[in-house]
Each structure stands twice: as C-alpha cells, then as structure tokens.
C-alpha cells in the first residue's frame, strides 16, 4: 500500500525547499563569503584577510581558522595564487612580494602567516591560555615546520635515485611518528589540553 509519505516530492515542492539562503556573514564559515561579522556591526571590522580564491593555501587557512575560532569580524579579499595565474596589480602594490596570506589590521599590512597570528594575538588576545610564544607551543610549532619540510623534501623536490627517494620517505614517516607521539601526550584530540594555536598551525 502506497501512502502519501512515501510519494516523491514534486518539482514545485523541491523548489520551495531550495529557497533556503545560508547566512554567509554571521552563520557557519564558507569559502565564498567576503565579510564575516559574527553578529557585530560592520563598523567594528578592523581586519581584512587577503587569501587565495579557492581556499587551498594552508598558510591562508590557518589565519582564516584563527579568525573564525576567535570570531573576529573581518573582510576577505581574494587574490590569485602564483601557480594559477597573474597576480592582481592592486595586490602587488599593497604586497610587493605578492605572497599570501596578508592581513590588514587597523590599516597596517602584515605578511607571513606566523607574523599575522602574532599580530592578531597582540590585538585580540590568544585563542586560549596558550599563545604563539608560549613555552608549550614553541616545540610543537617547530615540529609542524619539520613536518612541512619533510613533506616538501619527499614529494616536491626531484630525487636523483630510488635510494634518495626512500630516504626522504623514511624521514617524513619518522616525523609523522613524532607528530603522533605529540598528539598521544594529551588525553583529548588536540595537541594541548584544548583546541588552540598549535592545532591551528598544524591545520
């Protein structure tokens, strides 16, 4: 026996359901938005994040994640990555190197993701009790740099022999084991007691 509950929805019913609009300014994060307010006034915005169009750049992502986690109102300007085309002239005037990310805070342009995070902590405070310069965060930040370097050495640079490739792979695997050990040192899923700057940096 067929009931009305088991009948498929009509096209008209489906269209009515599709009219839902996501609040990209105050709702969940989304890579397409150009403004995030978290319920505050647009006049409160002190920060502009310059990031890649497609939300692929890991350095942009960690600054983006920090702003989202701290719920700091900010604007987003999207910039072409070097590997995808010509850098916009307006951006090269603002950031001559053309590198991403960049952040404008109260009119001052800051580059390099770690320098940006330090400036954000100075302006708005750390995500929790552990900031970028905390003695508990520093060795883990160094481990993240080792992980990145090991990954790049293994996968991004050409090797001259199979033996050299194997050595790079083993080095990367060894660093991953160190990361796993660091994660296992806390009872929860984060590098320290709670989600914080170290997790943002590893993201």
Feature roles, as predicted:
Residues 193-203:
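GST superfamily/GST-like fold recognition
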Residues 1-190:
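GST-like domain detector, emphasizing the conserved glutathione-binding G-site
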């Amino acid at each position: 026996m067929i009931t009305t509950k088991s009948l498929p929805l009509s096209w008209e019913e489906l269209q009515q359901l599709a009219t839902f609009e996501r609040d990209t300014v105050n709702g969940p994060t989304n890579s397409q938005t150009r403004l995030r307010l978290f319920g505050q006034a647009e006049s409160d915005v002190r920060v502009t994040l310059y990031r890649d169009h497609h939300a692929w750049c890991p350095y942009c992502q960690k600054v983006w994640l920090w702003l989202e986690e701290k719920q700091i109102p900010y604007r987003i300007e999207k910039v072409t990555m070097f590997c995808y085309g010509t850098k916009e002239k307006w951006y090269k005037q603002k950031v001559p190197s053309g590198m991403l990310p960049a952040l404008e805070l109260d009119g001052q342009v800051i580059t390099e993701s770690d320098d940006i995070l330090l400036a954000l902590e100075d302006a708005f405070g750390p995500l929790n009790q552990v900031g970028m310069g905390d003695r508990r965060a520093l060795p883990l930040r160094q481990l993240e740099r080792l992980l990145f370097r090991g990954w790049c050495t293994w996968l991004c640079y050409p090797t001259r022999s199979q033996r050299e490739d194997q050595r790079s792979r083993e080095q990367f695997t060894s660093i991953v084991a160190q990361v796993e050990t660091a994660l296992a040192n806390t009872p929860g899923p984060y590098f320290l007691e709670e989600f914080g700057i170290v997790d943002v940096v590893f993201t």
